[in-house]
UniProtKB/Swiss-Prot annotation:
Belongs to the aerobic coproporphyrinogen-III oxidase family. The record marks 175 as: Important for dimerization. Involved in the heme biosynthesis. Catalyzes the aerobic oxidative decarboxylation of propionate groups of rings A and B of coproporphyrinogen-III to yield the vinyl groups in protoporphyrinogen-IX. This is Oxygen-dependent coproporphyrinogen-III oxidase. The active site is at 106 (proton donor). NCBIfam families: PRK05330.1.
Length: 299
C-alpha cells in the first residue's frame, strides 16, 4: 500500500490527545497548549503540564513540518533524499515526576516521507520508549519490559530483543560509561515489509507507552520521601540533561536545523543539580542504582 501521511497524522493527533488526557487524569492538573507555526512549512502543538501533584513537569509535543528540500545536514548521510520534498511528523513526550520513587519516562513515535515526481517515495517510521528510575524496583522494570515485549509479539518473536538491544545501545552516556536508565524499545528506519505493517507497529508502540508507565506511577506516587531522595533525584536528572544535549540525535538535529527551540528543550527537567565527584554512601539505595541500570534481560 502507498504510504498515507494523512492517516499517520490523524493517529498522531489522537495519540497526543489520549496521552494528555491519561496523564491529566493521574495528576489532576491540566496541560497548557502552545500552538506554533514553522516559517518554512508546518507547525505543531506543544502541551505542558507544570507543577502538578504527581508530575513536576510533563511535556507532550506534536509536530508536522514539511518543505521543498531537505537541509544539507540531512542529505549528507542520505544522498537519495536530495532534490525531494519532505514531510516529518511525530509525537514525543517526557514526564518528570515529583516523587523520586517514580521514574522519569520518555516516548516518541515519528514518520518521515520524501517524494519527487516520477520516483517512489522514500519513507520510514521510528520511535520507542525508555524508563529512567532513580530508585530501582524489579517489579517495575519487569512490568515495563513485559509490556514492551507483549506489544512486539504480534510482529514477530525477534522484534522485542532487537529493539531492546537498540534501546540499550542508544541510551548510553559514553562520557560516563553508564546507561541512562533501564531502556525499553528503540527503532528507526522501519519500512519493511510494507506501510500497513510498519504503521501498525508504530501505533502499538505509541499506545503501549501508557500501559507500560502509568501502573508504575500509580504504584509509587504516594511513597514517602525526604530531602535525601529529592537531592539524589535532582543529581541524577543531570545525566538526563547530559544525554540530551551531548548524545541525542533528535535534539542535536533539531537545534542544528533551526527547529523550534522551546519544543526541543521541553524534555529538560525543570530542576537539576550537579555535584563535583559525587559518591553515594556505600550500601545505600542510591549506591544500588548503578547496578540496577546495568543492561540485563529483565524477562
Amino acid at each position: 500500500m502507498k504510504p498515507d501521511a494523512a492517516q499517520v497524522k490523524t493517529f498522531l493527533l489522537q495519540l497526543q490527545d489520549s496521552l494528555c488526557q491519561q496523564l491529566s487524569a493521574v495528576d489532576g492538573a491540566p496541560f497548557i497548549e502552545d500552538a506554533w507555526q514553522r516559517e518554512g512549512g508546518g507547525g505543531g502543538r506543544s502541551r505542558v503540564l507544570r507543577e502538578g501533584r504527581v508530575f513536576e513537569q510533563a511535556g507532550v509535543n506534536f509536530s508536522h513540518v514539511h518543505g521543498d528540500a531537505m537541509p544539507a545536514s540531512a542529505t549528507a548521510h542520505r544522498p537519495e533524499l536530495a532534490g525531494r520534498s519532505f514531510e516529518a511528523m511525530g509525537v514525543s513526550l517526557v514526564v518528570h515526576p515529583l516523587n523520586p520513587y517514580v521514574p522519569t519516562s520518555h516516548a516518541n513515535v515519528r514518520f518521515f516521507i520524501a517524494e519527487k515526481p516520477g520516483a517512489d517515495p522514500v519513507w520510514w517510521f521510528g520511535g520507542g520508549f525508555d524508563l529512567t528510575p532513580y530508585y530501582g524496583f524489579e517489579e517495575d522494570a519487569v512490568h515495563w519490559h513485559r509490556t514492551a515485549r507483549d506489544l512486539c509479539l504480534p510482529f514477530g518473536e525477534e522484534v522485542y530483543p532487537r529493539y531492546k538491544k537498540w534501546c540499550d545501545d542508544y541510551f548510553y552516556l559514553k562520557h560516563r560509561q553508564e546507561q541512562r536508565g533501564i531502556g525499553g524499545l528503540f527503532f528507526d528506519d522501519l519500512n519493511t515489509p510494507d506501510f500497513d505493517h510498519c504503521f501498525a507497529f508504530m501505533q502499538a508502540v505509541g499506545n503501549g507507552y501508557a500501559d507500560a508507565y502509568l501502573p508504575i506511577v500509580e504504584r509509587r506516587k504516594a511513597t514517602p520521601y525526604g530531602e535525601r531522595e529529592r537531592h539524589f533525584q535532582l543529581y541524577r536528572r543531570g545525566r538526563y540533561v547530559e544525554f540530551n544535549l551531548v548524545w541525542d540525535r533528535g535534539t542535536l538535529f533539531g537545534l542544528q536545523t533551526g527547529g523550534r527551540t522551546e519544543s526541543i528543550l521541553m524534555s529538560m527537567p525543570p530542576l537539576v543539580r550537579w555535584e563535583y565527584d559525587y559518591q553515594p554512601e556505600p550500601g545505600s539505595p542510591e549506591a544500588a542504582l548503578s547496578e540496577f541500570i546495568q543492561v540485563r534481560d529483565w524477562l
